[in-house]
Structures are given as structure tokens and as C-alpha cells.
Amino acid sequence: MAEHDFETISSETLHTGAIFALRRDQVRMPGGGIVTREVVEHFGAVAIVAMDDNGNIPMVYQYRHTYGRRLWELPAGLLDVAGEPPHLTAARELREEVGLQASTWQVLVDLDTAPGFSDESVRVYLATGLREVGRPEAHHEEADMTMGWYPIAEAARRVLRGEIVNSIAIAGVLAVHAVTTGFAQPRPLDTEWIDRPTAFAARRAER
């Protein structure tokens, strides 16, 4: 039996903002019915697990207005610079947020953060061969941001204690724990990113 083609019959833009857009699609379901699906379009993002020679990783403590509190997270950033390859975005964010540069980059894990309503996808990189390069002047929430170094095993325990709740950080921490314990291997830097978002970046480029 052939798979059903979920055809989009029509699409309406409800909102276009600085970092996301909201659209309403009419989609044909199996059996012929038409249903409404609302989709948040997103730039997509990258995050970095930067591991030093002793198996420690830096995490940032950043205020998130959505929750009204600070969360422990990985260095990360949006893919909001047109034409910038994702791994170079990751390298820039690593330098800007924690003042580090890495000589080796690999793909650790990709995650679709909210597939029920958003096309946001995040690629988490493993960065090694670290050296300090200094952090540039920060602005907005990042000016308040602090950093801490954690052994990978301790970071994994903090996930399971509920002290790290950011989903991207959880995925990255548990993935690097799997790598360092021999359970899995990271992937090459040029690994295809199947779900990398493109709709919102294209929409912004047209403005």
C-alpha cells in the first residue's frame, strides 16, 4: 500500500516576526478530509558540546524570559546569518558565548524540538581541541550570562536530577555521555541535515 501524500491545499501567513513566523495550512488527510494545521516556522539553530582534554564541558546559565528564570544550557545560536554554514555559526557562537575555539568538529546529534507545531530543528556539534580566545562584549540577556565547567558524567546526573531542563542541552549532554562511554560515535561534519529549516529564512530574504 502506497504511503499517503499529505498535500497542502492552501497556506496563510498569520504572523511574521524577528525570529519566527506562524502560518495556517489546509492539509489533505487519508480518506480525503481537509484539516487545519498551524505551523511555527523557525530559522533553526546550532548548539555545541565543547569537550576539553579532561572530559569537561562548558555550560551557560542564561535568563529565559519565557520561563522567567535562568536555565543551564549549551552554547547555542540561531541560523540567522544568510549564507553562513551551520558549523561556522557554531564556531562563532562558541567564541561569543564562552570564548573558546575548537580545532575539531563533528556532528553529535540532530533534534526536531517540537514537531507537532514547529519546523525548528537543531544540530548539536561535538567540538574538541579547545583553546581560549576571549569572549567579545555581550549584549541583552547574554550580558548577564555566566558559565560553568562540568564533567560529562556530572552533567548527565544533573539532567536526571532535573537541574538541566533545556531540551537541546539534555540531548547534547546525554549524546556526549554515550560517545565517551563507548556506546556510540559522532558523525562527520558534512553529514546531511535532513530537517534543517528553510522556509523562514527564505521568507525573511524576500522582505
From Swiss-Prot:
Q: Which organism is it from?
A: Mycobacterium tuberculosis (strain ATCC 25618 / H37Rv)
Q: GO CC terms for this protein? A: cytosol
Q: Where does Mg(2+) 3 bind?
A: 93, 97, 142
Query: What cofactor requirement does the entry state?
Result: Mg(2+); Mn(2+)
| Cystine residue pairs | none
Catalytic residues identified in the record: 142
Q: Which reaction does it catalyse?
A: ADP-D-ribose + H2O = D-ribose 5-phosphate + AMP + 2 H(+); 8-oxo-dGDP + H2O = 8-oxo-dGMP + phosphate + H(+); 8-oxo-GDP + H2O = 8-oxo-GMP + phosphate + H(+)
This one is known as ADP-ribose pyrophosphatase
> What does the subunit comment say?
Homodimer.
Q: Which Pfam families match?
A: NUDIX
Record function comment: Catalyzes the hydrolysis of ADP-ribose (ADPR) to AMP and ribose-5-phosphate. Can also hydrolyze ADP-mannose and ADP-glucose, with lower efficiency. Has weaker activity with NAD, GDP-sugars and UDP-sugars. Also catalyzes the conversion of 8-oxo-dGDP to 8-oxo-dGMP, and 8-oxo-GDP to 8-oxo-GMP. Functions in concert with MutT1 to detoxify 8-oxo-dGTP to 8-oxo-dGMP and may play an important role in supporting cellular growth under oxidative stress. The catalytic efficiency is much higher for the hydrolysis of ADPR than 8-oxo-dGTP, suggesting a more relevant biological role in hydrolysis of ADPR.
Q: How is the cofactor bound?
A: Binds 3 Mg(2+) ions per subunit. Activity is highest with Mn(2+). Can also use Zn(2+) or Co(2+), with lower efficiency.
Q: Where is this motif: Nudix box?
A: 77-99
Keywords in alphabetical order, please: DNA damage, DNA repair, DNA replication, Hydrolase, Magnesium, Manganese, Metal-binding
- Which of this chain's residues are annotated to bind substrate? 37-38, 64, 78, 114-116, 120
GO: which molecular function terms?
8-oxo-dGDP phosphatase activity; 8-oxo-GDP phosphatase activity; ADP-ribose diphosphatase activity; metal ion binding
- Give the EC number(s) under which this enzyme is classified: 3.6.1.13, 3.6.1.58
- Share the entry's pH-dependence remark: Optimum pH is 8.0.
Q: Where is the Nudix hydrolase domain?
A: 41-172
Q: Mutating residue 64 to A has which effect?
A: 3-fold decrease in KM for ADPR. 910-fold decrease in kcat with ADPR as substrate
